[in-house]
Amino acid sequence: MASSAQSPHFYLNPGKSNSFQSKAYKQRNVNFYWNFGIRRLFLRKSQGLSVLSSSSSSTHFSNSQLHGLCANGKLEEAMKLLNSMQELRVAVDEDVFVALVRLCEWKRAQEEGSKVYSIALSSMSSLGVELGNAFLAMFVRFGNLVDAWYVFGKMSERNLFSWNVLVGGYAKQGYFDEAMCLYHRMLWVGGVKPDVYTFPCVLRTCGGIPDLARGKEVHVHVVRYGYELDIDVVNALITMYVKCGDVKSARLLFDRMPRRDIISWNAMISGYFENGMCHEGLELFFAMRGLSVDPDLMTLTSVISACELLGDRRLGRDIHAYVITTGFAVDISVCNSLTQMYLNAGSWREAEKLFSRMERKDIVSWTTMISGYEYNFLPDKAIDTYRMMDQDSVKPDEITVAAVLSACATLGDLDTGVELHKLAIKARLISYVIVANNLINMYSKCKCIDKALDIFHNIPRKNVISWTSIIAGLRLNNRCFEALIFLRQMKMTLQPNAITLTAALAACARIGALMCGKEIHAHVLRTGVGLDDFLPNALLDMYVRCGRMNTAWSQFNSQKKDVTSWNILLTGYSERGQGSMVVELFDRMVKSRVRPDEITFISLLCGCSKSQMVRQGLMYFSKMEDYGVTPNLKHYACVVDLLGRAGELQEAHKFIQKMPVTPDPAVWGALLNACRIHHKIDLGELSAQHIFELDKKSVGYYILLCNLYADCGKWREVAKVRRMMKENGLTVDAGCSWVEVKGKVHAFLSDDKYHPQTKEINTVLEGFYEKMSEVGLTKISESSSMDETEISRDEIFCGHSERKAIAFGLINTVPGMPIWVTKNLSMCENCHDTVKFISKTVRREISVRDAEHFHHFKDGECSCGD
């Protein structure tokens, strides 16, 4: 294709005819394209070029010197000479300015280029086409569209090169609307006809928006001006159509091409892949091979990416074998793509082999492996690979640090996370929002939420992921109030996505914030965000955990149902001890042809356990493999709980001894809890011994043992367990309960003395305590005659915060209205008896969801049966 004098290639001399580009000039061995054939006459070879003597002050001589310096690429000396010429008021010729501007562009010297620009403007009222084009090309190359636009306005005359450069500059930086406006202005105001360089720029703009209607309009112009057979223009048209999703039109153009180059094939093949038509793209690739067209790097990386999207391991291996025959297997970008393909397909061992055989590894290679390990749930290997990378003296970038931080978050590896935080600060990677977001996630999962908050507040431009990370982190650290406050703050500047709202709904479910959950539901219905994703299940879970089963059923019936939807309902009824309903739901689920998973059977077994449906529970356990589910340790723990709650402790112990796998602390914990229920100290101590051999850091097992001893009156043993906890540095979360009144959630701590209605709350509770004493029921108050150790045990492991929440609800709601309370710890026996008494006395329904059960109190009875 012949190059036009008005083309946007920077190495041509715009504004002059092609005859000026002589054959001798083109063949000259000069590295600088701005040498216009003027020989380096009168060039001074002395070092004192910054000062001009009076004898050398002629304009012609000075301009010749300056032009010669530009021709030799000596920018620093050229700038010194320019400054001296300005001091002596020696005029600079326009062609010398052009040479100097092109040198600044080639050297990427933005500061010097701006200075030359200022000098030129101060000495000229307007810019000629050649100098204006030089400034345009320079500023566009620097990404400075503001000054480029100003230069464009100062030009006394413009040619096609001027328009092409500016349109291309706007398109390259993503200002597609502005680029299209310039194109139309060029046609209708500038009176300039587009050429083979104009159309690719404009078509790139249409594909970038994307705007198919404008793209078709430009296609009409291509035909009108006679460029429909130009291969570069047609390639640009194909790319535009596939970017706009019109693959059919792109293929029509492709099939009509009289001649195709590798760019044509790549545009069509990658276009199929970008539009999710991987099989069609692969068919075209095989057709290309059949025509003996050799692929290039772009072809192969695109095809490998398609195999990755398809998850087809066999096809991926075939493509890998073909790549080896092409000789591109040693190319690092191809190796990186193959590694990514294997990792995404779950074939991490094959990725390891390929990675180990790579002769040279760049930062992308290491980051791909680290991210791939994390993707395949191998965070240990991800961190080990990072250590290897460090030993190989490869400096991580922001993507690497983010990937390793994600692995640290999965493992709860705070030490490595802090190390990476320091590295990010030192390497100035902390300014990348992806690093900050992953630091928030890491600190949140390592229970350092205050550190996560510090990082969040220091992010100058928070994106949706930043807000989502901190909201999820606050929820994870049981600071649900703050999570919901952050959601409201986020809505002032950004729209939450489905993941954000899912985290917020989990916070609502945790503290029983029904009204806030309903607000989120209304937002979802109004905006439609996440309706086809996992958000409906999050809404269902929120209603179930807030105790609104009728609303939960309405949500369940209105949404697309998957195994997670059924599991949420099963868990909800299981927590309420409604085993018959759990069994009925399971049967309906199977009849609906939804395949149960391991979580389904956990809920099913727990439901049978709490309803003492031993026979049915054992039957379902024996049939698990019929549904393709292999029992794991959680299921074995459920069976132990099933037998233990029913009083069959010896059978439960024998079941543990016959397990085909080694029991974990959860299995022994289920037996310990059964011993607590039935006051069996010997077997309980045996269970605790096995637990503490395996796990000395889980506070819940210490609480179970304490409760076993306390229920049997062994207060010295309670004190011993308390000392063990202290020696191991274990603490119990403070008791906290939440109650929603008039759409607002109120929190109550066990030792809360600062609530504005504390006096009224205490008065109400004391009234109930007096009535309980009158009928011979025990109570917990400061005047209790109970052993101090027992009082301490109840205060620590329960806190009685639900009593304050219930009293607050009674004070601030009308008689007869149900009260819903959520608690972070388990209810103690005394609180359970107290709430039963209150429900009977005030004739109200009171629901309390604690850490283990859902208690529904009515007329002095509880749904749990205790």
UniProtKB/Swiss-Prot annotation:
InterPro entries: DYW_dom, E_motif, Pentatricopeptide_rpt, PPR_At4g14850-like_plant, TPR-like_helical_dom_sf. It is found in: Plastid, Chloroplast. Residues 743-773 are annotated as: Type E(+) motif. Keywords: Chloroplast, Plastid, Repeat, Transit peptide. The keyword Repeat applies. The keyword Plastid applies. PPR repeats lie at residues 58-92, 93-123, 128-158, 159-194, 195-229, 230-260, 261-295, 296-330, 331-365, 366-396, 397-431, 432-466, 467-493, 497-531, 532-561, 562-596, 597-631, 632-662. PANTHER family: PENTATRICOPEPTIDE REPEAT-CONTAINING PROTEIN, REPEAT-CONTAINING PROTEIN, PUTATIVE-RELATED. This is Pentatricopeptide repeat-containing protein At1g15510, chloroplastic.
